[in-house]
C-alpha cells in the first residue's frame, strides 16, 4: 500500500522571505544557475557549502550588478529566516553592530556571518513570487469577475497578496519545481543544455535544502516533518527513487513524487478562513452594514505559528493583549477610522487597504508590511518595515534595519518611536529586539521613483508629540525604550516649559472665583474644539470605561 504522505509549502519563507516587489532581472533563473556553478567551483573560498557575506557581496555586486544595500538586504533577510530566530543571539548581534564605530568595522562584523548556500539559492529564487506577469496584465479578466467580490474575510479576491496567499504558494512551487531542483544539482548531473536529464541524481544535501520550502506529514497526523525526513522514509523509496547505496534520488522520480504529494498548506490562511476560530473582539457599529470579521487558526501543532486575520473594523477602538496574538502572523485588512492596539509580541504584521486609522503594535519579530493604505499611523518596534502604494502615512518606529520603500508611495513621514506600555521591554526581549541600532530615519528606496523628497520626509520636531497608550497593564516599562533623539526631546522640553510658564501666569493673575470658572469653561470649550478638529474626539468616545478597558486590553 502506498504511503500516505502529504507535503505543502512552508509559510514563513514565502510570507516573510519573498520581498513584495518584482525582483531585479539578474535574480532570474538563468543567473542563479550561473551563481550555483560559481559557488560550487569556489568552495575553498567561502562560497560552498556555506556562503559568507564577503563572498555574496562580491557575487551580488560584481556578477549580478546589485547595489550593496540590496545585496545586504537579501542576505540579512535570509539569515534571519534560518535557523528560527534566537532572541539572545539576535540581541548579541545587535549589540555588536551598534558598537561599530565606522563602516569598515561594521563590514568586519558582518563578515563573520554565513548562510547555507543551497538554501540561499532557493531563497533568491523565491523572489520570483512577485514577478510581474506581462501575460496576466495584458489578458486581464472578464468584467465583472467573480474575484471582484470580496465577500467575507479577505481571501484571494480581496487582497491579491501573493505573500499571504497559500494557493499562490502552491501554484508557485508546482510551476517552478523543476527549475528549483535543477538549481540544487551538482554540475556533473546537468546535461549539455545546463538542464537535468532522465539520469540525473539529486543528492541528499539538496533534498535537505529543499526542506527550507517544503514540509509535510504522514497519514494526516498532527506531527509535522521536514521534507528530507519524509523522503528517507522506507515506504517512499520506490516512488521518489532513493538509493541507499549512493544516498541519492532519481531526479524524475523525485520530481513526480513531490508533485503527487503537494497540497495546499492545511495550517495556512485558507484553512484559517474556512475553519478557523471566529473572535468576538470587535463591536458592530450602529448605522453601518459593515461587520467586522476576526479569525484565527487554532494552534493545532506546536511547529505552526498562529494566524490572526482581521477585516473591516470600522469606527472603533480595539485593544488586545492576548495569548492568541503571541508569535502570530497578523493580517489587518480594510479597517477604517479606527484605533487598533495589539499589545503582544508578534511574528509578522501585514496592513492592507486601511484608511484613516492608527495601529499600535507590540514588538514584531520579523516584518511589518503596509500596502495600499491612506492616512494611517503605525507605531511599533519591529525588525523590518516595508511600504508599498501608501499615501500620507506616518510611521513611528524603532527598527534595527532600514525601512524599505517599495513602489507607489507618496508623502510618507518617518518619526522616532514615542510610546510605551508596561510589558513593552519584556516583549522586546522575547522577540530579540533591542533599542540599538535604530535606523528609523534611514529608509532605503528599493524602487526608485522620482526624488526622495516627494516620497518621504522625517517628521519635524515641531510637529512631534509623544503618544499615550490609554490602558492599564502589569509590567515594568515606564518610559519610551531608548529615549528620544535629542532634537525631538528638546522640542518636547521647550513645549513643556511654555506650558509651565502659562500655568504660572494663570496662577499669578489673581482671578476671582467667577473669573476662574469662566476661564475654565473657555479652556474646556477650546479643548473640545481641538478634539473634534484633530479627530481625537472619536478615539475618546470609542474608549470603554477603565475597568472594562483593562479587560479588553488584557483578555
From Swiss-Prot:
<dbReference type="GO" id="GO:0031616">
    <property type="term" value="C:spindle pole centrosome"/>
</dbReference>
<dbReference type="InterPro" id="IPR016098">
    <property type="entry name" value="CAP/MinC_C"/>
</dbReference>
<keyword id="KW-0963">Cytoplasm</keyword>
<feature type="domain" description="C-CAP/cofactor C-like">
    <location>
        <begin position="302"/>
        <end position="433"/>
    </location>
</feature>
<dbReference type="InterPro" id="IPR039589">
    <property type="entry name" value="TBCC1"/>
</dbReference>
<dbReference type="InterPro" id="IPR017901">
    <property type="entry name" value="C-CAP_CF_C-like"/>
</dbReference>
<comment type="function">
    <text>May play a role in the regulation of centrosome and Golgi apparatus positioning.</text>
</comment>
<dbReference type="InterPro" id="IPR036223">
    <property type="entry name" value="CAP_C_sf"/>
</dbReference>
<keyword id="KW-0206">Cytoskeleton</keyword>
<dbReference type="InterPro" id="IPR006599">
    <property type="entry name" value="CARP_motif"/>
</dbReference>
<dbReference type="Pfam" id="PF07986">
    <property type="entry name" value="TBCC"/>
</dbReference>
<protein>
    <recommendedName>
        <fullName>TBCC domain-containing protein 1</fullName>
    </recommendedName>
</protein>
<comment type="similarity">
    <text>Belongs to the TBCC family.</text>
</comment>
<dbReference type="GO" id="GO:0005737">
    <property type="term" value="C:cytoplasm"/>
</dbReference>
<dbReference type="InterPro" id="IPR012945">
    <property type="entry name" value="Tubulin-bd_cofactor_C_dom"/>
</dbReference>
<dbReference type="GO" id="GO:0051661">
    <property type="term" value="P:maintenance of centrosome location"/>
</dbReference>
<dbReference type="GO" id="GO:0051684">
    <property type="term" value="P:maintenance of Golgi location"/>
</dbReference>
